[in-house]
Every structure is written in C-alpha cells, then in structure tokens.
Amino acid sequence: MPRMTNTPIKNIRNFAIVAHIDHGKSTLADRLIQMTGSLEEREMKEQVLDSMDIERERGITIKANTVRLEYDARDGEHYVLNLIDTPGHVDFAYEVSRSLAACESSLLVVDASQGVEAQTLANVYQAIDNNHEIVPVLNKVDLPAAEPERVKAQIEDVIGLDASDAIPISAKTGVGVDEVLEAIVMRLPPPHEGDASAPLKALLVDSWYDAYLGVIVLVRIIDGVLKKGQTVRMMGTGARYPVDRVGVMTPKMVMVESLGPGEIGFITASIKEVADTRVGDTITEDKRATAAALPGFKPAQPVVFCGLFPVDAADFEDLRAAVGKLRLNDASFSYEMETSAALGFGFRCGFLGLLHLEIIQERLTREFDLDLIATAPSVVYRMNLTDGKTVELHNPADMPDPVKIAEIEEPWIRATILTPDEHLGGILKLCQDRRGVQADLSYAGSRAMLVYDLPLNEVVFDFYDRLKSISRGYASFDYHLTDYREGDLVKMSILVNDEPVDALSMLVHRSQAERRGRAMCEKLKELIPQHMFKIPIQAAIGGRIIARETISALRKDVTAKCYGGDVTRKRKLLEKQKEGKKKMRQFGKVEIPQEAFIQALKMGD
C-alpha cells in the first residue's frame, strides 16, 4: 500500500510531459515508472501508459493518462510525483489543455535530432498560459544525428525558454533519467497551498468507462479532503453521487482512504455514463459545498462530421451499440442517426479532427469487428437565411433551398507550419491553392515558420498528406479554429443515370467546383461497371451540369446470325436493339457497388 495522504504538500509535484509526436514522451514516462519502482519488472511493458492497442501500434498517445510515482530524493526526503502523460497530436489538444490545468509544471521533451516541431510549440504555449514552470529535456542524445547544442539554441530562439540547463537524456537506454527525477524535485514547484479543513473543492480532470467499476473520474484536489462514503456534487450539472472508492493510479489502481489538497487520484461512484461527468467541472461535498466553482474548460466542439454506415445493413444494431460504447469513453465524439438512399441506415458522427475520425473508425472496425463505409468528411457550415435565422449544416444533403440562403459562412483555422526552408516554395503553393491567406513568415536557423489562415474545408481532405509528401515528411503542422467567414460556397451534387446520389454530394468553393466535379466523375467512370445501357455521370450545381462522363453500354451482337442477305434485316434488328436499350435506360436501375463508394470517398482532390 503506498504511503498515503500524509505527504506534506511541499513534497508533492504535479507535472505533465509535453512533446511533439514521436519525441519520446511515453518512453520517458516508462523509464520514470521503472526507476521509481512503481511497477515490478515483470509488469513493465513498452509504453505502459498507452493502454489502447491502437495507441501502441501507431506510437501515439490519445487519452491522457496519469500515474503516481513515489521517489526518495538525494536530499533524503520522500516525494510523491504525479505525472500526467499528454497526447501530442493536434486533434487531441483539448486533452492536453485539461491535463495542463491539473498540474503546476511541465517537462518539455524535444528530440535532439529533430528539434522543435509545430506541436511542441502549441503545447508549450498552452503550458505557459497555465503559468507552468518548464524544464527542457533533450531526448535521444544517443543517436548519431543528435545535435544537442543546435536544438538548445533553437529552443531559445523559437520558444524563448532558457535552455542552458536543459537535461540531456536517452529515454530508451535510461541515461540521464535520474537527473530528470532530481530536476522535478528541485526545479519544479509544489502545488499551491490548499486548505485541508476547507470545504472540498476538486477539479474533474478526466473520466473513462470501466466495465466493472462504471465511470472512473480522475480528480485533482484543490481544497478539502475527499473520502470514501462522502456524497459529492458536480457543480456544473448538479448531480449527486456517493463515493464508492478512492484511489490512485500507480499505473495500477490502488485504493486509498482519502486524498488531500494538491493530490491527484480517482474516485468511482455509481455514475452510469461518462456524459454525466463534464470535464473541467468542480466537484464539492454535497452537505458542505464550496462557495465558488473553479473556472472550467470549454467543452470540446466537434469540428469534422462524416456519416458512418455498416456495409451490411444487418449490422446496424451492432453499430448503434458500438458508437454508444465509444461515446461512454470519449465525450468529444458525438453522433446522431441518419438515413441515406444509397447507403441505408447509419450515423452522422462528429469528431475533433481527421486523426480522431480515423481512430474512431479504426476502433469500430477493430474492437467491434464492423465493416463500415464513411462518407466524405465535411465541416460545420453556418447558413444565414433570408428570414434572419441562422442554422448549422452538418450534412451537405440537408442543405436548404439556395433561394432561402442569404450567405454561407465556413470555419477558418490558423495553421502554424514549421518546415526546412528548401521545401518552403512547394508549401506556399499548396496553401495558396487551398485558398490560404498568409499571416506571417519567420525563420529560425534553417527552418521557416509559416502562419496561414485557411478554410477548414480545404484542410479536411488530404492537406496533411500533401504537406508531408511535399516536404518529404519534414514539415510539421498545427492548427486551431479561429472564426467563421463568408464564402462563395455551392452544393455540388453527383448524378448517376440522372438520379442524385446523396452520399456523394458536397459543399465546395465555386472556384474549385469544376475541378472537383470532373475528378469525381472520372473516378466514378472507372469504378462503376458497364450496364446494358449507357450511363451518364454528371456533377451539377443546382440545375447546371458542370462535368460529365459517360459509361458506354455493353451490347450483344444481334446481327451475328445474319449471313449475308438483305441489309434491311440487319437494320431492323439494330433498330429493335436500340428501342430496347432506350426502354431499359428509362427503367433500368444502376447498381453502384460498395467498393465504388469507398474509393470515390477516399478521393481527396
């Protein structure tokens, strides 16, 4: 049983690790856990804190995780270190923001061979906004390509942090990790003095669903003491719950009697779903409530929407159960039912960004064994109607009659791109092609930092992939939503055999409608098999056709049985065939194979 709750507040350290993807923060967390003996050797595995298989395989952290480490420092004191591991990817920025709000300080991990990247910047600025004390750590110094001095200079130039006493380490081999532990104790501040006798005030940092214990809530105690058996109240929702268990993560769950000021731990109460626990809410005791709630976080707003449909209509109920379960664990993922003429029943789902979308899709296929079709991702548009109302549009198929629309506004983002300067030309061209507006360009050594305003609609498809291919994988990219701006947007419908296919309709900028329409028609021409009659494939804006391709008909050689003889006989047979084809075209249904949908929707450009 860990030594509990009697730790003096001056011996507690709450810290987060911030870094760009792949700079080694989960590996450093593994080493810290190993060196403080929180897990026995046999329980250690790579990336202990990345609990989902998908996190381990992709080598990314998605959910923020927490662990309590006990450390006997060189000064003879016994310390409790609460580490919160944060995701590095831009889609999970809100996971980072709430992790940082629960701590007083951060370790900034920078790869000594790669240097500062765009997400390093974004996360460090968040840490600075939270008034964090930051200790820079240079990881991977054992690599032949490591240039610690250059990277130190870069940290000072780009971020403006003093890196003269940055700690050189190799998280993989464990070199220098003991210095990190000492720096945490010596250079990072303890939590602000809390009052143990005051009414309970705790920040709800995170919550997730466990099949046995129900919802587990991660809390950071500010004032007061949280004990088993107390009745607590969520100040945001007003819901009351009796506390069943109190514990800490070491990363295993260890039950304790109580948690005091400055500590981070978890509670379980009979809470049925994660949606009942709002992240950033204040938890207090029901009988003796605290006067003021803590300033909360703004809830994560879904930014990208797409339809998810089962390939086999019989799997719809399984899909319903699966999205419900994912929602239990991920409150930022939203969904509602929708139907499509082409694809049947499914769900319209909202995500924080493209990586989030990809991961949810992958989890549905993997954990729940479902075959899915995803429609083209779209963003949330605002329609200002002529009668003065404003409506939000999540699905292009639901767009109101163009006559009723006064203007359409689309979301814009502020993107920060860091790239080696030899790729700058290609990236500038990419941003301009995507209707970007340059806001800033500066240099730090041989790297350029570009700031662009871009419409989110242009980034959603394949911007990231294109950026990586232009820069040979060296550019990094980070963005946040800024505002909505009016845009000359039109709804492009795809017609197959004069029938609109709702799953393929999309909102595009007028200047790009023709290019996108032509590309889509060409793609469908390759994908839809020939029928017995001619099939036109058209892209249209309203009633105006902007692109067309035709799939020619399969035809039987009806004149094969005529040997010589009169030409009018042949003509009669051909005329008869022509009539039949005409009739067939009128009544024939075009079967669009599922594969064609999947391929056509993958098309970014």
Curated annotation (Swiss-Prot):
Subcellular location: Cell inner membrane
UniProt xrefs under PROSITE patterns: G_TR_1, G_TR_2
GO MF annotations in UniProt: GTP binding; GTPase activity; guanosine tetraphosphate binding; ribosome binding; translation elongation factor activity
Superkingdom as given in the UniProt entry: Bacteria
UniProt membrane topology term: Peripheral membrane protein
InterPro entries: EF-4, EFG_III/V, EFG_V-like, EFTu-like_2, G_TR_CS, LepA_C_sf, LepA_CTD, LepA_IV
Any Pfam family hit: GTP_EFTU_D2
Binding positions for GTP per the UniProt entry: 22-27, 139-142
Keyword vocabulary terms for this entry: Cell inner membrane, Cell membrane, GTP-binding, Hydrolase, Membrane, Nucleotide-binding, Protein biosynthesis
GO cellular component, one term: plasma membrane
Boundaries of every tr-type G domain copy: 10-192
The protein's Enzyme Commission number: 3.6.5.n1
Family, as annotated: Belongs to the TRAFAC class translation factor GTPase superfamily. Classic translation factor GTPase family. LepA subfamily.
HAMAP family: LepA (MF_00071)
Function, in words: Required for accurate and efficient protein synthesis under certain stress conditions. May act as a fidelity factor of the translation reaction, by catalyzing a one-codon backward translocation of tRNAs on improperly translocated ribosomes. Back-translocation proceeds from a post-translocation (POST) complex to a pre-translocation (PRE) complex, thus giving elongation factor G a second chance to translocate the tRNAs correctly. Binds to ribosomes in a GTP-dependent manner.
Protein name: Elongation factor 4
